[in-house]
Amino acid sequence: MSEKNSFNPEGFSYYDCNRIFPYCHNGKCKNFSKLMYLIIKERIYNGHSIIIDHLNQNKNEINHQNEHGWTALMIASVTSSYWCTIDTVKLLLENGADPNIPNYKGETALGLVVGSLTRINCLEINQRTNFLKTAQLLIEYGANVNFQNDFGDSILNHSGGFILNSSLQYNNFDIIKILLDNNTNPNISNNKGNTLLHNICIYNQSCDDIIKLLLNYNVDLNSINLKRKTVLMYLCKFYNKTNNVNSIKLLLKNGANPNIQNTKGNTAMMYLFNKFYHEYGDNKYNIIKLLLQYGANPNIKNNSGISVLLRASTIQNGWERKNIIKFLLKHGADPNITNNQGLTFLMLLVKNPQNHMTKEFLNFVLKYVDPNIKCNKGKNILHYIPSESIDSPDILKRLLEFTTNPNARDYKGRTPLMLACKKFTSTNDIVKINLLVEYSVISLTDNNGKKALDYAMNNTSNIRLFMVSILLEKGDTFDVNIKNDPLSKCLNFVKQSSIAKQKYDIMLSKINIEANKFILRPSSIRTKILTVNWYIEHHNFEKLALCDYSQLMEYLGATDIDDLKLRIMENINYMD
């Protein structure tokens, strides 16, 4: 027998319980009863009457199970559209076939029929109709519509939602409605805690119509699975699906709670930020509006201390990030909420050099946020200004103008200027250093007694000399021991030279003072010349008559009084 025909009963000309026979379109095994063999050959032999005769004589075969646990009823139910007939299904039920016996995979005849409808795209209209009639017949004869297999999956959701996916795709709610009309519990959960509604929202592109249907059958919109995830969370997680916005609105209007938290503390709104579907930014924005409109609390934190505002700060798309943050702030999000590290959303924005932030956006944010909040390490937002960011000089300037404290100290006593001198490496950072120096107290020291200048000295980048120069020009002083570092040696030499020059200048000034004191003493020749000249110019002959000219005439070499006057005038012309 070829592989192509291995599931075709036509190739099996005689019965043997040890032979392998097909029992459905993709299954085959041994240990068939003669009744099972006759069922798969019914349409070939036109053998319904043969089955009746055999069953009358062999009723003990009615619930016999083959090697895979399938009964004659299971085989007849799933092949009633192509190998046997629905009349045979009814015949078996009338003769005591048990519709609730499970096969070795934990599936009953009804579950197998419903599962066959997942291949609805492969079926013709009459085949689909036949399966629906078979399902209804099994229910009429006591099939348990709430039966759960070994994985806890019920008839409706045991295929992990694929049943519903196919049914919805082909606009066929008939089997779902049949089950619900016959008291199927829509809130039964499987071993993972997922209900029918969970599976719908996980596996389907469109959920609106099935949600509307289930709302008529007391479905629990807030049912949680073992991870405490709700249906609303899954819809938000897969918000990129085309109709999820409408489905979310439908759930919220009918009482879905947006503030339930899963085992990690995440709410439905937080799931909007788990994946970055940039092309669906409008969907995300509209869903956030809906959730807030129906009472979502934007300030709930998950187990990691993250709120939706903190999550929004990680959105990569700048336009989307800005608009969502603005919307959240306008609608009650706490601007100063912090994560477990004490970081605010503004700190997270500023510290990432990839985030482009305009002055307009920062001015808007500063209406709400306190920039002087410190994280768990004692840092304020200025400590997080990054290196090499295009926007950071403008952002830094605006923050400094907004009275953000430039002298705030972290847990190691370091100021923003100290950290900047330590970590900045780009020539673009020199502008930021200048700004921080302008607003900061540069003489502050950390817990180890280090100043910003010390941090600049230990910076090994190309801008070290610029930073050191800026600090020295601002008035800082270099006070370290000579090291092997050439710059340290140079600065120390400059410092020692500066000290020597200061001492030299002091010495010269003292020499000048003492020299003037000596030159201008009353008994000096210089003083006497100036005194006599002053008397002559002012015609004070009385004082002049009292002067002793002998020493002066001898010093100047004058022969008489008139000659003395001439020599005095000549000497005065050369005095400074």
Curated annotation (Swiss-Prot):
UniProt keyword list: ANK repeat, Repeat
Taxonomic path: Viruses, Varidnaviria, Bamfordvirae, Nucleocytoviricota, Megaviricetes
Extent of the ANK repeats: 68-101, 118-147, 159-188, 192-223, 227-260, 264-300, 304-337, 341-373, 377-408, 412-446, 448-480
Keyword Repeat: yes
Source organism superkingdom: Viruses
Entries under InterPro entries matching the protein: Ankyrin_rpt, Ankyrin_rpt-contain_sf
Organism: Acanthamoeba polyphaga mimivirus (APMV)
Protein name (Swiss-Prot/TrEMBL): Putative ankyrin repeat protein L86
Family matches, as SUPFAM superfamilies: Ankyrin repeat
Pfam families: Ank (PF00023), Ank_2 (PF12796)
Keyword Transferase assigned: no
